Amino acid sequence: MPEKKIDGRRKAAVLLVALGPEKAAQVMKHLDEETVEQLVVEIANIGRVTPEEKKQVLEEFLSLAKAKEMISEGGIEYAKKVLEKAFGPERARKIIERLTSSLQVKPFSFVRDTDPVQLVNFLQSEHPQTIAVVLSYLDPPVAAQILGALPEELQTEVLKRIALLERTSPEVVKEIERNLEKKISGFVSRTFSKVGGIDTAAEIMNNLDRTTEKKIMDKLVQENPELADEIRRRMFVFEDILKLDDRSIQLVLREVDTRDLALALKGASDELKEKIFKNMSKRAAALLKDELEYMGPVRLKDVEEAQQKIINIIRRLEEAGEIVIARGGGEELIM
């Protein structure tokens, strides 16, 4: 019987499942994150692997000829175990969250193939809630481009509705899709996922140009100051300091209390710590390293409060035009 032709990515997935979580994790440690994500999608969708397919793959990889266990069906739980062993629970959780969308068919796929200018012309006549649902399913840079091109009186209302979205019922999404289908394109919906929320609104705002972002936020502050503050808090997190240039970091450090800086860095990545040390004098960096070393255990609440103080300083300096935070926002759409 001639060998069945197996897709390369599926072969890799079959091999990893055959290896078991421990050894598969060791292999994954040597792969880049994009490849890991592609393989996990394949593993999660692998279905039942026949003994013939397993034999064919293992014979191709001679070093695995003595594999002892039957291949399991795979699935997201298996993928999660492998990732946890390879990268630890936290990073595994983040990868799985990103992959969830890859394992589902997203609604509004026809919208992603529509010219942005045409989409703006169409959406601006829709109800703000409809626009909010549609934008929540788009990638943040695309959603930001469309939001920025909507009439000003719509922008704040739509962002507010995106931020307040949590779970949209499948019936509502289906109804919106049916209506859009008649006007734009045919689409058959199959599955739905969590959409919208403050994080989505913040991501979209991060991808807007500074002028549009400020106009929307100023208006939102007047209409719903609590929501505006919550969105603003999510728009810049402590690790985003990595996006600042050296001059901006130095300006920030001049205004930060040393104790607050040490506390804030207690919960920071090594990459961020190194960037901070690099922008200090050798003596100041040495003193800060000593303080970090001898600080001992600290409460997470204290670390977060210290980080928030520094974020507030960064926001104030940006508002004053003294520093610039790298943001998205491509060319504006001219209507």
Curated annotation (Swiss-Prot):
Intracellular or extracellular location(s): Cell inner membrane; Bacterial flagellum basal body
Pfam families associated with the record: FliG_C, FliG_M, FliG_N
Site (Part of the EHPQR-motif): R161
Membrane topology label: Peripheral membrane protein
UniProt entry tagged with the keyword DNA-binding: no
Motif (Part of the EHPQR-motif): 126-129
GO biological process, one term: bacterial-type flagellum-dependent cell motility
Any one GO molecular-function label of the UniProt entry: protein heterodimerization activity
The keyword Cytoplasm is assigned to this record: no
One GO cellular component term noted in the UniProt record for this chain: bacterial-type flagellum basal body
Keywords recorded for this protein, A-Z: Bacterial flagellum, Cell inner membrane, Cell membrane, Chemotaxis, Flagellar rotation, Membrane
InterPro entries: Flg_Motor_Flig (IPR000090), Flg_Motor_Flig_C (IPR023087), FliG_a-hlx (IPR011002), FliG_M (IPR032779), FliG_N (IPR028263)
Subunit field text: Homodimer in the absence of FliF. Interacts (via N-terminus) with FliF (via C-terminus) forming a heterodimer. Interacts (via central domain or via central domain and C-terminus) with FliM (via central domain).
Known function: One of the proteins that forms a switch complex that is proposed to be located at the base of the basal body. This complex interacts with chemotaxis proteins (such as CheY) in addition to contacting components of the motor that determine the direction of flagellar rotation.
Family, as annotated: Belongs to the FliG family.
Protein name: Flagellar motor switch protein FliG
Natural source organism: Thermotoga maritima (strain ATCC 43589 / DSM 3109 / JCM 10099 / NBRC 100826 / MSB8)
Gene: fliG
